[in-house]
Amino acid sequence: MDVSGKKIVLFGGTSGIGLAAARQLAALGGEVIAISRDPGKAGDPGPGITLKQGDVRDREALQALFKELAPFDVLISAATGGDRAIGPFLSMDMDGFKGSFDKLWGYANVVRYGTEYLADNGCIVLVSGTPARKTRPGQIAIGSVGGAVEAFARGVAPELAPRRINVVSPGLIDTPMVGLKGDERTGFYGKATANNLIPRAGTADEVAQGIVFAVQNEFITGTTIDVDGGLLLS
């Protein structure tokens, strides 16, 4: 797909991976609407990007937003969906575990209510993460959610055809979601990625390149694109 002149609706597009994708798609000539619960945190997102407020978990408001923005060519969700439970499952608060699945419900809402207004040759891109297929201790919640997102995309792809749907799966990425600073931040990423085939954290721009590829390549659907520095193989 030639992105130039296409309308792109991007949830979670005001920080981190989502904002990086918004900027790259806008640089290619796309008309990007970047949506999040707090669009102000994007600051000045740059040319070609319009900011809007929205919550993928609010189905009624989401349907109204899609009607307002329709029609569009590309639908992307990099929204986290809320809090993520971390730690051993057998001592985990089950409300926290359940809340982690807000990401899945949000993605399902985006696909369910957005497809109606998506161009016949349009595409959808979702974001999961390597814990979906390589779950480390303490990652049972995010691993389960990511696995469900990838299975959801594979399962719904035949219904969406000829529209496409794909998932981009990041490894450990240096984004604002990690609240550490200075030497503590550097040490965390260094230790966490020491055994990667590419021994460093990825960048939001590198993951965004995977999202752009999923948009542009018209011969892929129902699959997952890994941008993880070889983490799955380490």
Predicted segment positions?
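Rossmann-fold cofactor-recognition segment
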Residues: G46-E60
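A glycine/serine/threonine-rich, flexible loop-to-helix segment
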Residues: I173-N195, S234
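C-terminal substrate-recognition "lid" of short-chain dehydrogenase/reductases
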Residues: T203-V227, L232
